[in-house]
Amino acid sequence: EGFIMSWLQGEALGARIVRSPELAEIRPKLAYQCGQILARIHAIDLHATGLDQCLHTLTPADYVHTTWDRYKAFKTPQPMIDYAGRWLLDHLPVGLEMALVHNDFRNGNLMISPNGVVAVLDWEVAHIGDPMRDLGWICTNSWRFGSALPVGGFGAYEDLFAGYQAVAGVEVDPTRVKFWEVFG
């Protein structure tokens, strides 16, 4: 076991990414780039790379049930969390093609330069799962840093989906993306 590192130049603080004047020119292109990057990540051959032997698989049902059980163990009911949890349990995606999922792909785990995305950081929770999780996670309100733009605070759904579809050659399922956005 081990890891390889190299020095990269860029910004990783989410609030700065959505506000920095130095990134103003690239910001409108970031959602599309993120879609392209996610399509490449999700296309990695799990068997050829051996990732199927070292990463665990989490279905949407596994993920939601585990999270729901942890929440209930606190025994501090929160009506909105209860409602969201029940909604998620009632709308679990099924029959999915699984892929490598970063699982924390968001503004704050991306390094951005004036040229675009330089790196995807923090892979410690990667697993095999529903690839739409990554697209939904970057759209979660928490990662917008006060911006009204839904994708990481810097872009539109349409741009994220277009970037993904351009590389993956498959349509993005907005319903599954919304499922994971609600989960977040």
Spell out what each predicted region is:
Residues 54-55, 171-183:
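All-alpha amphipathic helical-bundle segments outside canonical DNA-binding/catalytic cores
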Residues 12, 51, 110, 128-130, ...:
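Conserved protein kinase catalytic core
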Residues 1, 41, 86-133, 137:
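Active-site acidic catalytic loop and adjacent metal/ATP-binding pocket
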Residues 30-34, 80, 104, 109, ...:
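An acidic site on a long C-lobe helix of protein kinase domains
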Residues 1-97:
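ATP-binding pocket architecture of kinase catalytic cores
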Residues 133-169, 183-184:
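Active-site activation/catalytic loop segments of kinase-like enzymes and analogous catalytic loops
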Residues 92-95, 170-174:
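Contiguous beta-strand/loop segments that form the cofactor/metal-binding neighborhood of enzyme cores
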Residues 58-59, 108, 155, 180-184:
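Aromatic- and histidine-enriched alpha-helix N-cap/loop-to-helix transition segments
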